A protein has these predicted regions:
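Aromatic- and glycine-enriched glycan-recognition loops and surfaces
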Residues: 1-4, 37-39, 71-76
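Solvent-exposed loop/turn segments at secondary-structure junctions
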Residues: 16-17, 36-40, 63-67, 94-99, ...
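Metal-dependent polysaccharide deacetylase catalytic core of the NodB/CE4 family, i.e.
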Residues: 26-30, 50-162, 205
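Conserved beta-strand->loop/alpha-helix structural units within folded catalytic cores of enzymes
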Residues: 35-36, 57
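A short acidic, amphipathic alpha-helical/loop segment
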Residues: 44-48, 77, 173
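His/Asp/Glu-enriched short active-site or ligand-binding loop at hydrolase and phosphoryl-transfer sites
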Residues: 60-61, 115-121, 146, 150-153, ...
Length: 239
């Protein structure tokens, strides 16, 4: 459906370049992203991308590569994906795709909350900043030390960029730490919309979440509905 309707998948490089030069974008650009680094990317997604002439972005939890096999990719498989020329390997934290104790019985996202220590003390903002920075640096180091390009995109685990948090000030600080390392950060949004020049300037790009319950037709309709008005006319035949 997407190819027939004139959509073209783009790379990290094209997305980043479009901030200064929108003319690098095709008429109907979109980006296909996958989170976590599950082995299904190699087994199922890559053959389909090859078949349809699309490319993908793998947001990888580097601390889980080569673990719990066969669920997560190995480093060899991740490298093989990169070498196809169809994939960009990007960051989804090192060990930060977890929920942490943040007070009472709450378990909340690692990146935007202060951890409650076993003695009941909440970590300080400085401790939390150091924790987030160390995780971000380790994710980058893991990818580059395995011969992969330095990541330039980051997808928030759970799409938790500002909520739920036990310290809004720290959530803002955490975003700044990530933005110092990655030119663009990504989150899922409930209402599909096209990424705007304002989003790219702000460094926070919206995504449409796709689950196993999402049909091809439903996804296509959501993408088309998010298009700027002049582009909403062309649709492929129903199937």
């Amino acid at each position: 459906m997407l190819r027939e309707a004139g959509f073209e998948s783009i790379s990290t490089e094209t997305l980043l370049s479009s901030r200064q030069n929108p003319a690098v974008l095709p008429a109907r650009p979109f980006m296909i992203t996958f989170d976590d680094g599950a082995s299904g990317l190699w087994r199922y997604a890559d053959p389909l991308l090859k078949q349809y002439g699309f490319r993908g972005v793998a947001f990888t939890i580097t601390g889980r590569v080569d673990t719990h096999y066969p669920y997560y990719l190995t480093w060899d498989e991740l490298t093989a994906l990169q070498e196809t020329g169809r994939w960009d390997i990007e960051s989804h934290t090192h060990q930060g795709h977890d929920r942490i104790p943040s007070g009472g019985d709450r378990q909340t996202p690692f990146l935007i909350n202060l951890i409650q220590r076993p003695d009941g003390r909440l970590e300080t903002q400085q401790e939390a900043r150091e924790r987030v920075a160390a995780d971000a640096d380790q994710a980058i180091n893991q990818l580059t030390s395995h011969g992969l390009p330095q990541p330039r995109l980051f997808a928030y685990p759970f799409s938790a960029e500002s909520n739920p948090t036990n310290n809004p000030e720290f959530a803002v600080a955490s975003r700044k730490i990530l933005a110092q390392r990655y030119p663009l950060l990504m989150i899922n949004v409930d209402t599909p919309r096209w990424a705007s020049s304002g989003d790219l300037t702000a460094g926070l790009v919206p995504r449409i979440e796709v689950t196993k319950q999402t049909t091809a037709r439903a996804l296509f309709d959501r993408i088309v509905a998010a298009l700027p008005a002049p582009q909403m006319e062309t649709r492929p035949a129903s199937r």
